[in-house]
Amino acid sequence: MSNTAFPAATIVGYPRVGRFRELKKAQEAFWKGKATLQELQDTAADVQRTYFERVTAAGLKADNYSIPATFSYYDQVLDVVRLFTLVPERLAEAKDARGLLDLPGYFALARGTETLPPLEMTKWFDTNYHYLVPEIGAGTEIKLNLEAIDEQLEVAKQAGVKVRPQIVGPLTLLLGAKAEQGSAEDFSPVDRLDEFVAAYAQVLEQLAERGVEWVQLDEPGLTVDRADNAKVAELAERTYGALAAGEKRPQILVTSPYGSLRENLPALLGTGIEALHLDLVHGVYSKAELESVSAAGVHLVAGVVNGRNVWRADVRAALKTLEALPGASEGAVSVSSSTSLQHVPHDLALEDPAEVPVDGLAFADQKVAEIALLARGLAEGEAAVEPELKAADEALARFAADPRKHNDEIRARAAAVTPEDFDRPTIDVRRAAQADLNLPKLPTTTIGSFPQTAEIRRHRAEARAGKISAEELNGFLRDEIASVIKLQEELGLDVLVHGEAERNDMVQYFAENFDGFATTRHGWVQSYGSRCTRPSILFGDVKRHGEGLRGEAFTVPWSSHAQSLSEKPVKGMLTGPVTILAWSFVRDDQPRRETANQVALALADEIADLEEAGIRIIQVDEPALRELLPLRRDEQPQYLDWSVNSFRLATSAVKDSTQIHTHLCYSEFNEIIDSINALNADVTSIEAARSHMELLADIPESFVSGLGPGVWDIHSPRVPSQEEIESLLKAAIGYGTIADLWVNPDCGLKTRDYEETKQSLRHLVDATKAIRASL
């Protein structure tokens, strides 16, 4: 084992899709058969080389392992599935002739094929990133395959960069996995920990043979409350004690992003690992805990630059924090991001200062520069970096004085909210008032969006470029809405949607119509696989655009047009306050509760205008409700209180005859089922197809809302058969009363194409008719 010192400045991850989404485009071309595997790999290498160039230009060094090998073709957890060939029996045909996962097989697990359903996907801790959930059984074979790591090492070698491989650690892997179908009821993937520790030890040995001197093992799973925290701490001590005992291995950095290690901190410190990363932004550590790191002789990698938000760091304050850390004066502290920078866009320099408040912002490349500056200040003293500190102070002062940040009328309105503003009559009263909707048993509907075709994107791009007028764009969009309504009528759906052709993104669309937001041109962030979003920047007080405190309606013209084309009810479609916050970069100068209530009141104004226009069913989507749930149980009640209340503030002023729907996806719901119930919606649709309706077992009899468990997994290109949907419906009926069930896809259809959509919806409607006939 080498004794190469850990670098003074580092990051624990970086955006992987490319500054201009080069990887996304190459992935999708490969999946469509328009690019070869070699062309995809060439693009991947280009993305990695650009990464090396950007971070070294920002201040990291190419020769000291400060740069992690952070690239992934799809997902970092799926990378470990490939590393160990963790293929469940039901997906065995994804393996190649060697019994390993090559890239096509890797993608098959992620996306499914005509014959293979994909792995389940869920949220990565409390972020907006999604990971593929490994399925591990008692007999799942472990077979090493370092091809992906070797590919990254070779690209780095050719670029003259010494990288440290970045691998999801064994505890996070197993704690985040699920038991393979057919496993014994009492089996858990963690039961096989010792076998996996041995497999990881083999990986470390092979990395040492390749000349690797540092490796990064990511253990965010140790910052989460578990059923038995003490037991997890014992497992952490056992795991890393065994890995550190290896005679032939790289030095080990363990990272702990997203929260606090708590009882896992002393467990790790006694194992013999060389370096430990602590998230000092989202985690809370006492002076004694920080002193214990230094006392154990473990190098502290201090995550002081926020890896999850886009605000410029107060580098002067951060430097003082670093200087006060035990061991800092002896060189036992390095400067890092709090988390991987995969959660923020690539480069603020790509944005127009007239459109975004650049004085207050830092994207990935700027955060790397902040880290390098702090490391220099820590090593050389504050005076050595005073010019840079002064420039940062001045930028933050300009941002604080920005008049767009504060509106006294908005603040007064939010402060005047009373408890009555959060309440609606009982569900029985509302159902009686909504009976004249005359919906059948098992009403069929979709979640909201329809495919965003190339033609739609072309028209929007031409309007932005001034090639067509706003009137021409609106005329095209009205025709597109008419086409979507006609298709739904032909398919026989019961409750229709207008398809959201006018929206580029379910949060950005609202940001573009609300005061207090800025939107970016190139601020892309990976959500999963090739799916990227452009989170908006919420930096000021919020209301709808337009004169007065209420502003002007912006969804009403589209919904009214759609409703005029059908006798069936057409849903008004809004994104809820929690999701708008979760999928934006949110101001950090006031409590989230206050910001959420401002957004909720703006949405309440829009809902009132939809009602006035005759829209009887209004859906307020909250797919991110679970996402923001704190990782530690003692911090969760406060969040659930304000998040539920913000939804109720947005929706509680409606008439009893107006049916409020909500939609949740990408989540493990069992922990918050009571809070979902407390939303007090009339109908709740949830993602359920990939989990085969398993989550319905957690829904109590006291659940008051109608329920639409998804019967079609829209995150995969495969078309479910009618029989498959019937099977899921029968399973759903087994969990609840037929009168309360709705039939719908898992999520919106924006990312699907029309051929898949038509076939799948036809099967959905036919399956529903067959089930109705059998009742």
Cite the ranges covered by each PLM segment.
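Domain-level signal for soluble alpha/beta catalytic cores
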Residues: 1-775
